């Protein structure tokens, strides 16, 4: 998943409407009104250098390694493979991405090493994303104790949507068509909307243990926060794609030669940067932190503890 430019806010102090005399002026017979304070505009910018934040992503490495070790122990003790194996894939890839942050658009990297390149990162991310969304969909089916057909259908829609999103993100990388990233993220919006609807219905209509009902509450809470955020993300991706393509610019025809060239480009081209705009600004920083190093790993591990060991 991807994000774009930083946000900059301004706070203006309030003031009255009366005019004031300049400090240096010609004498006047009528006199001057009392001077009013000059107007001040305070700028509160987003940090332009993300270097400290990118280093802080390393804190996600021991977190994911710990979760991986605990999950592997649960699996060795006979835990549910449909819950635990997807989690193990996710934890290992998330630790990797905390070590070697990458942004596909522009092949932006923090560490100038082949391990940060877009192609290997995307291959690993494909397995990770499909795995953990499959786990989330399996959770819905496990908690659908009344076997409601349309709830199961929504859970499988999540798997289909993440598969379609993989198609679009790979197409964006291999054809350099930035607009395709929008459709990738639209797939994520659809699958989490399905997860939120299914979780809400099950929570309202199904009698579950507190721990299992808590999983539905987590899904609902995430959906209420993520879906509005994703709307902003989609808008920013759309605007960014338009800003990088002029109206008269025709995309290069999609040929095997184009795909091969962009694959080689994604494997070998790296652009080291710590500029906030290159990493997607506030949206990009929020996404990386929550996805690899905090919220999603914690959520997936909680699923493992509740359903993977019973």
State where each predicted segment sits.
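Hydrophobic transmembrane alpha-helical segments in integral membrane proteins
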Residues: 41-63
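Short aromatic-rich membrane-water interface segments that cap or initiate transmembrane helices
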Residues: 47, 114-127
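C-terminal transmembrane-bundle signature of multipass membrane proteins
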Residues: 58-67, 198-310
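Internal transmembrane alpha-helix with an interfacial aromatic "cap," most often the third helix
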Residues: 64-73, 98-105, 122-155, 163-174, ...
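Membrane-interfacial loop-to-transmembrane alpha-helix junctions, especially the N-terminal start
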Residues: 76-89, 146-159, 209-218
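Aromatic-anchored segments of alpha-helical transmembrane domains
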Residues: 90-96, 159-171, 223-229
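Helix-loop junctions on the outward
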Residues: 94-120
């Amino acid at each position: 998943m991807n994000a774009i430019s930083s946000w900059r806010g301004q706070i203006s102090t309030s003031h009255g409407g009366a005019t004031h005399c300049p400090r240096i002026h010609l004498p006047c017979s009528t006199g001057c009104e009392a001077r009013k304070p000059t107007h001040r505009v305070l700028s509160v910018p987003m940090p332009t250098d993300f270097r400290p934040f990118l280093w802080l992503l390393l804190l996600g490495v021991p977190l994911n390694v710990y979760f991986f070790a605990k999950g592997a122990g649960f699996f060795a003790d006979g835990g549910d493979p449909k819950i635990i194996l997807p989690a193990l894939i996710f934890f290992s890839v998330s630790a990797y991405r905390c070590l070697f942050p990458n942004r596909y658009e522009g092949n932006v990297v923090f560490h100038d090493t082949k391990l940060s390149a877009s192609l290997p990162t995307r291959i690993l991310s494909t397995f990770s994303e499909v795995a953990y969304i499959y786990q989330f969909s399996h959770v819905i089916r496990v908690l659908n104790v009344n076997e409601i057909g349309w709830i199961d259908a929504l859970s499988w829609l999540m798997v289909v949507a993440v598969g379609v999103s993989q198609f679009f993100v790979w197409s964006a990388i291999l054809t350099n068509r930035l607009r395709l990233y929008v459709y990738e993220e639209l797939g994520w919006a659809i699958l989490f909307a399905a997860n939120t609807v299914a979780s809400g219905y099950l929570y309202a209509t199904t009698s579950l243990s507190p721990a299992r009902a808590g999983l539905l509450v987590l899904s609902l809470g995430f959906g209420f926060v993520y879906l509005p955020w994703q709307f902003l993300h989609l808008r920013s991706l759309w605007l960014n794609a338009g800003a990088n393509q002029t109206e008269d610019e025709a995309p290069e025809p999609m040929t095997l030669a184009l795909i091969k060239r962009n694959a080689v480009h994604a494997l070998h081209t790296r652009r080291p940067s710590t500029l906030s705009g290159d990493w997607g600004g506030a949206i990009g920083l929020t996404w990386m932190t929550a996805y690899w190093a905090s919220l999603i790993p914690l959520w997936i591990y909680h699923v493992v503890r509740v359903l993977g060991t019973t």
